[in-house]
């Protein structure tokens, strides 16, 4: 990961939901992360390519899209922004059965889908993949 010496890791958040976006940003800041918040794939690629911080992790909310499409969006962001192939992608699943609740499923070399039971589960996964 591109963690800079004495600099908190940076998470690129793709969150189209206006209600969730500020909460997610605040919670990630409280955990010690630097946060780049974007609304969609195009915005995420532009921000990740920019002159500012390069993300150490990509966090995407499924938000009404099929899960496989969201995984592909994450992979395109990583590729088109020129991020390392081992940059983790975490998808927050929106729709799932009770049997999946509380699970983190690896769907690629460094790609994960998290079926959230609570916010602490997400923070634990992020700390494991991108320690502060």
What are these regions (language model features)?
Residues 43, 65, 82, 94-99:
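Negatively charged, flexible loop motifs adjacent to catalytic sites
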Residues 18-37:
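Two-component/phosphorelay signaling modules centered on CheY-like receiver
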Residues 26-31, 47-49, 103:
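Alpha-helical interaction/dimerization surfaces of two-component signaling modules
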């Amino acid at each position: 990961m591109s963690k800079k010496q004495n600099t908190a890791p940076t998470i690129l958040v793709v969150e189209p939901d206006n209600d969730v976006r500020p909460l997610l940003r605040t919670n990630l800041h409280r955990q010690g992360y630097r946060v780049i918040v974007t609304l969609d794939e195009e915005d995420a690629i532009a921000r990740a390519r920019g002159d500012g911080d390069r993300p150490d992790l990509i966090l995407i909310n499924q938000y009404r899209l099929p899960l496989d499409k969201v995984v592909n969006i994450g992979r395109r962001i990583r590729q088109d922004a020129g991020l390392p192939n081992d940059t983790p992608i975490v998808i927050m699943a929106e729709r799932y059965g009770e049997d999946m609740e509380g699970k983190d499923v690896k769907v690629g070399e460094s790609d994960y889908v998290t079926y959230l039971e609570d916010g602490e589960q997400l923070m634990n996964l992020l700390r494991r993949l991108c320690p502060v």
